[in-house]
Amino acid sequence: MKYRDLRDFLSLLEQRGELKRISQPIDPYLEMTEIADRTLRAGGPALLFENPKGYNMPVLCNLFGTAKRVAMGMGQEDVSALRDVGKLLAFLKEPDPPKGFRDLFDKLPKFKQVLNMPTKCLSSAPCQEQVWEGEDVDLSRIPVMHCWPEDAAPLVSWGLTVTRGPHKERQNLGIYRQQVLGKNKLIMRWLSHRGGALDYQEWCEAHPGERFPVAVALGADPATILAAVTPVPDTLSEYAFAGLLRGHKTEVVKCLSNSLEVPASAEIVLEGYIEQGEMAPEGPYGDHTGYYNEIDSFPVFTVTHITQRKDAIYHSTYTGRPPDEPAVMGVALNEVFVPILQKQFPEIVDFYLPPEGCSYRLAVVTIKKQYAGHAKRVMMGVWSFLRQFMYTKFVIVCDDDINARDWNDVIWAITTRMDPSRDTVLIENTPIDYLDFASPVSGLGSKMGLDATNKWPAETPREWGRPIKMDEEVRARVDAIWDELAIFSDKETKR
């Protein structure tokens, strides 16, 4: 599925009945959240609020409100096809050496695909059709949503933040929420291990006292947004990967006030800087946990320029108790993660992040167990292999006869194959999401691994139970007479 920018993607959604235009005046203060939340929970379409109260700019919500639309944003027609995206990433992350000339020939298309996707830098771009700078900069022109009653202020939620470290050629793209602080100021809430925060830290060390350039793209195309939250190999830029997803090179343009490159088709771009040492208290905000988070200090982003397309669209979302857009995206991106994990740990059969677990806080893994202690090795691997799982608090490991996506199966395995003392792994003082108020210290907490696999002789001296299973000949005989028994009126009742 190919598209060029957000508007092109919205046209495709509308053709397929996946976009609903709302012409009634709707308030960005709370009302949009309530409508978007009800729509998402019902599996409904993306929403384009054409007449936000008090504004002349339409607001787009629920763009990634179903796993299918996430897949479409990644250039695929179906969620199952995201496994192929994961396989490509796994290959690029750690290419296998060719086993011979024929194998090398077979691998060439993958390398050619990547080499053909560098960015294309334009001299002018749609995102700079209109420009405000200096005293004309006013964030109140943008219909930024105020999502929950006790939120501190309106919150920019889909800001694609572009930074570059002082010793890096490659830019970093990250999605960080930003509290509106004034007409030209926002609070940049990035966690210390995120790419933007690391770039800023390195800048402060290399250039003490100098302003750190930042750009934020609002309304970038879906492929670029999704590339920013996907485990792209360090050797591949998010822009190049976005080009692979959408089927053509990512077009960028240099900012007017600095050398950062932003998506040329973005609806709105905020340019500016962070003054070293300028911090402000951020929050509280209703978050993806379903709770308001505590207040903490983060850097202040000063906006010097606002550039935008004519008739710009503001792309927004809300976060709350699952399901919300992050949870839905987690379900879809789960399919991308599986091949990447299997590349490193071939014994993994399936990997599942239940949306009820706030996108990433709990993982269920099924494996082909090969030796005593195998489950514990897999736990450690999940926590350490991808940055996306460093905040996963609970990892449940089961055998491959268990369906990782069926809680009936998983709970049965936990309650019948686990001893709480022997099969529970607790690790203290590990990195934890700052938003996790249950941890004893902000940003630092514990992790739990549950080994719900069948135990091997080295793991228990007791004889292990054998699963109950009906004789296959008896099942076949009953199958043959089942309909005649007419026990249920519904003939489609499962046998």
Swiss-Prot record:
Disulfide bonds: none annotated. It is a peripheral membrane protein. InterPro entries: UbiD, UbiD-like_C, UbiD-like_N, UbiD_bacteria, UbiD_Rift_dom. The keyword Cell membrane applies. It is an enzyme of class 4 (lyase). Pathway: Cofactor biosynthesis; ubiquinone biosynthesis. It is found in: Cell membrane. One of its GO terms (molecular function) is 3-octaprenyl-4-hydroxybenzoate carboxy-lyase activity. It catalyses: a 4-hydroxy-3-(all-trans-polyprenyl)benzoate + H(+) = a 2-(all-trans-polyprenyl)phenol + CO2. Homohexamer. PANTHER family: 3-OCTAPRENYL-4-HYDROXYBENZOATE CARBOXY-LYASE-RELATED (PTHR30108), FERULIC ACID DECARBOXYLASE 1 (PTHR30108:SF17). This is 3-octaprenyl-4-hydroxybenzoate carboxy-lyase. It comes from Yersinia enterocolitica serotype O:8 / biotype 1B (strain NCTC 13174 / 8081).
